[in-house]
C-alpha cells in the first residue's frame, strides 16, 4: 500500500511541474517563433529624419483544403490536398521620392492576401 502512495506522489509532482511549465510559457510564442505578425515596419535604408518610409513585413499563414473533384480531373498529377499561400502586402500606400530621384511606395496599411510573386 505504501508503494502506491509513492507512485501517486511522484505522478502528482511530475504533473504539477508540467502544468507549471506550460502555464509559465507566453501565449502562442511557440507556434510562431521568430516570425512576427504582418504589420508596418520602418525601412531604415530609405527613411530619413522627419520622413520615415514604411514597408509591410511579417508572416501570414497558408491554408490547405481538400481538392474539389472537378479540379482533380484536370490535374496532370492529381493531389488530394490543395494549399493556398498568403503574403504580407500593402493594402494602401503613397508614392514617395527618396535619395533625390528614386520613387518608392510608402505603405500605410497592411494585410494578408494572395501571393502573386513567389521566390524561386
Swiss-Prot record:
Glycans are attached at residues 80, 106. GO terms for cellular component: extracellular space; follicle-stimulating hormone complex; pituitary gonadotropin complex. Residues 1-24 form the signal peptide. It is found in: Secreted. It holds the Pfam family Hormone_6. The keyword Glycoprotein applies. GO terms for molecular function: follicle-stimulating hormone activity; hormone activity. Shared alpha chain of the active heterodimeric glycoprotein hormones thyrotropin/thyroid stimulating hormone/TSH, lutropin/luteinizing hormone/LH and follitropin/follicle stimulating hormone/FSH. These hormones bind specific receptors on target cells that in turn activate downstream signaling pathways. Belongs to the glycoprotein hormones subunit alpha family. Heterodimer. The active hormones thyrotropin, lutropin and follitropin are heterodimers composed of CGA, a common alpha chain described here and a unique beta chain which confers their biological specificity to the hormones: TSHB for thyrotropin, LHB for lutropin and FSHB for follitropin. This is Glycoprotein hormones alpha chain. It comes from Rattus norvegicus (Rat). The lineage of its organism: Eukaryota, Metazoa, Chordata, Craniata, Vertebrata.
